[in-house]
Amino acid sequence: MSPFQELLADVPQQGRVRWIGVRPESRAEMIELDAVEARREAGLTGDHSRPGPRNARQVTLIQWEHLAVVGSLLGRSVENPVLPQDLRRNLVISGINLFSLKNRRFRIGQAIFETTGWCQPCAKLEQRLGHGTFQAVRGHGGINARVLQSGIIRLDDTVQVEPLDINDPWPPVRQHA
């Protein structure tokens, strides 16, 4: 492994689950939860995500620290912050750079995930939150993930990167960035 590859492989930070939410239907309001079951190839219980191994967007994650960044880019005051449910992601994580999870598997609570790509903003966010939202969220929208091992996720659970296994016959999916 080159020195650069070693730097990419070493993720010493651990994250923490700060918020959990599901959408029972596509345009429904987010439901905030204290715990949720992540189901292999199906996403989160109660979320409208399409089941199946080919769905690369079973679970969406955003970085807690980016909520303030998006709020600032939208010109919001501290008294009117962007809330987790505003950006409609399932899990809000603090303490770890979600971009360091690219091409990696990671554990949250009992569940194991793999990153499948960046979670880009959509036109619906612009309609819901107002003009400029699309540009404010670009680069701060988080990641998409697929559930590899089912398990329960709770508020305050730890987010840990799984060690790289160079002998893995099924390496994590490679993303186009």
Where do the protein language model's features map onto the residues?
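Metal-cofactor-dependent catalytic cores
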Residues: 1-177
